[in-house]
Amino acid sequence: MLRHLLVFSLIALLAGCAGLTSREALEGQGNPAQWQIHKQQISQLDGWQINGKIGIRAPQDSGSATLFWLQRQDYYDIRLSGPLGGGAARLTGRPGDILLEVSNRGRFKAESPEALLREQLRLDLPVSNLLWWIRGLPAPDSRSRLTLDADSHLARLEQDGWQVEYQRYVEQNGYALPERLKLYGQDLEVTLVIKDWQPRQLGQ
């Protein structure tokens, strides 16, 4: 009986470790198994609507704007309005087909959102990774270092030269989602405050 119990315990332990991909280095006070459950639940969210604010601090320029973000699986519609970006800007598209519309300046197309924002708004933002970070998840295509809080949610994330601090979560429709987070890049600090989360599972 004891032998069987030990075997089952070992299997459960190995299964829990298998859920941690080799790309993730995990630390902190949270429970790795609970993190995997949370990660799997949040990963199923492939649609959302967000209303909030974004603030950016850089050596030569700073500003803030209201943020609207509509996500429908791989399609996104991100809108900024306010001093940041010189008025209003709208970023829409899906991987490989991105459109940026800037008030009083026109429409611009590119294959990556990062290139468009860098060229037209002088913003060096990792939009492709933000699709994951905004949900409190690491992007799956590169290595990351994760620090868990006592609730087994992300407290800190290091990935692709960026550091993300998750300062507050909110419970919305049964999902624990980031409400306030700060991103630190090279000579850039970004603050995101989400005032309204509307998560969706569209693939069901």
Swiss-Prot record:
Signal peptide range in chain numbering: 1-16
Amino-acid biosynthesis as UniProt keyword: no
Matching Gene3D superfamilies: Lipoprotein localisation LolA/LolB/LppX
Residues lipid-modified (N-palmitoyl cysteine): C17
Gene Ontology BP, a term: lipoprotein localization to outer membrane
Location in the cell: Cell outer membrane
Family note: Belongs to the LolB family.
Stated role: Plays a critical role in the incorporation of lipoproteins in the outer membrane after they are released by the LolA protein.
Quaternary organization: Monomer.
Name of this chain's protein: Outer-membrane lipoprotein LolB
Species of origin: Ectopseudomonas mendocina (strain ymp) (Pseudomonas mendocina)
